[in-house]
Amino acid sequence: MEKQVEIPEVELNSGHKMPIVGYGTCVPEPMPPLEELTAIFLDAIKVGYRHFDTASSYGTEEALGKAIAEAINSGLVKSREEFFISCKLWIEDADHDLILPALNQSLQILGVDYLDLYMIHMPVRVRKGAPMFNYSKEDFLPFDIQGTWKAMEECSKQGLAKSIGVSNYSVEKLTKLLETSTIPPAVNQVEMNVAWQQRKLLPFCKEKNIHITSWSPLLSYGVAWGSNAVMENPVLQQIAASKGKTVAQVALRWIYEQGASLITRTSNKDRMFENVQIFDWELSKEELDQIHEIPQRRGTLGEEFMHPEGPIKSPEELWDGDL
């Protein structure tokens, strides 16, 4: 058996532990065949990844489920309990009565009895069956922050999700959610990287004991919707060269040192190893100060979730001015 890396864990406010580095299963188009995707996820398991992040909108739940089943059946992993599986509710199911059925469907496709973490993907709602990312004014519906969270709490109470959380929530939206919640979100999965350091959201979530996970530690470098603002940043390039590390490792280590966890995605097995070689060294105060000086700009505005006559009309409304 190949030598596996060991990834530290963080304890969430739910009492459950989550590996600091997760493997992301959102893959760029064109989607690889099921067998190829399953093999990639199995490679990640062989490397030592146990935290896998998926979503109903990714179209990768089946391949992930097959990889997990194969890993268990082959003896590579002892049991389902060794995995931390997170999944996200898509916006067409972001309504009180649709959430439990959506979770059950994800469980069925994944072939598991429970999720370790279930999150609301976006604080947005569209009509059921609306064409993904090609929404018209009629597709957008009002999103009930407190009502959707009540249904998420029910998922937790039924034991179908050990922890529940949100994704892409601002300070203002979290504040509204917390006004009526009985179970606080364990995680807020957001865009966070050296080019968007979440200087408003991060301290708020720390104060409320809500853990931040970055879904964009490298800003999706190399794919159509991505950006070079992290991987081609001269500050990171200089730090990486001086430490004998890669730019990616410096970017990932910075997130870890902020007390956040991160989701990485690569089909390259060498880079799977590289992305978790971040725990036995640290950044100096001078290096952290240099990173703090990097100009800040949110990379993803989410304009596909806005309409001039819809519930959300602008980036300012979606992110409550935190741009």
From Swiss-Prot:
Quaternary state and interactors: Monomer.
Domain of life: Eukaryota
EC number: 1.1.1.439
Pathway(s) of this molecule: Alkaloid biosynthesis
GO biological process, one term: alkaloid metabolic process
Tissue: Expressed in leaf epidermis.
MF terms in GO: oxidoreductase activity, acting on the CH-OH group of donors, NAD or NADP as acceptor
Binding site for substrate: H121
Main function: Component of iboga and aspidosperma monoterpenoid indole alkaloids (MIAs, e.g. tabersonine and catharanthine) biosynthesis pathway from 19E-geissoschizine. Catalyzes the second oxidation step of the unstable intermediate product resulting from the reaction triggered by the geissoschizine oxidase (GO) in the stemmadenine biosynthesis process from 19E-geissoschizine.
Region (Disordered): 302-323
Family affiliation: Belongs to the aldo/keto reductase family.
One Pfam family recorded for the sequence: Aldo_ket_red
Recorded phenotype for the gene knockout or disruption: Reduced accumulation of catharanthine and vindoline, but accumulation of 16S- and 16R-deshydroxymethylstemmadenine (16S/16R-DHS) and, to some extent, of akuammicine.
Keywords: Alkaloid metabolism, NADP, Oxidoreductase
Catalytic activity: 15alpha-stemmadenine + NADP(+) = 17-dehydrostemmadenine + NADPH + 2 H(+)
Biological classification of the source: Eukaryota, Viridiplantae, Streptophyta, Embryophyta, Tracheophyta
Active site, renumbered: Y58 (proton donor)
Positions bound to NADP(+): 53, 167-168, 189, 215-220, 289-297
Name this polypeptide is given: Protein REDOX 2
Record-marked site positions (Lowers pKa of active site Tyr): K88
